[in-house]
């Protein structure tokens, strides 16, 4: 494993730990998820450039599409929660509340 891949793996792990630790605010969770998607994208690009199989070339584009969809849904959810409740706490996302 090269130093670049090791650093990206560490960044992914830190983003995952941030997602698990800072679950109170939706905005911090979304930022950590975007960091994870960025690390996955960079790892996919480096892997596809190193190995050169033709099947790996569209995978970074697919990851970018999923990251854009995740960001759009996350921001829509953040706007809905903050306009409804006035805060971005994740505990407000419980739909079973009366």
UniProtKB/Swiss-Prot annotation:
Q: Which InterPro entries match?
A: NADH_UbQ_OxRdtase_chain4L/K, NUOK/Mnh_C1-like
Q: How does it sit in the membrane?
A: Multi-pass membrane protein
> What is this enzyme's class at the first EC digit?
translocase
Bilayer-crossing regions: 2-22, 26-46, 61-81
Q: Which Pfam families does this UniProt record tie to the protein?
A: Oxidored_q2
Gene Ontology MF terms in the entry:
NADH dehydrogenase (ubiquinone) activity
Which reactions is this enzyme annotated as catalysing? a ubiquinone + NADH + 5 H(+)(in) = a ubiquinol + NAD(+) + 4 H(+)(out)
What's the subunit arrangement here? Answer: Core subunit of respiratory chain NADH dehydrogenase (Complex I) which is composed of 45 different subunits.
Report what the protein is called.
NADH-ubiquinone oxidoreductase chain 4L
Q: Which organism is it from?
A: Nyctomys sumichrasti
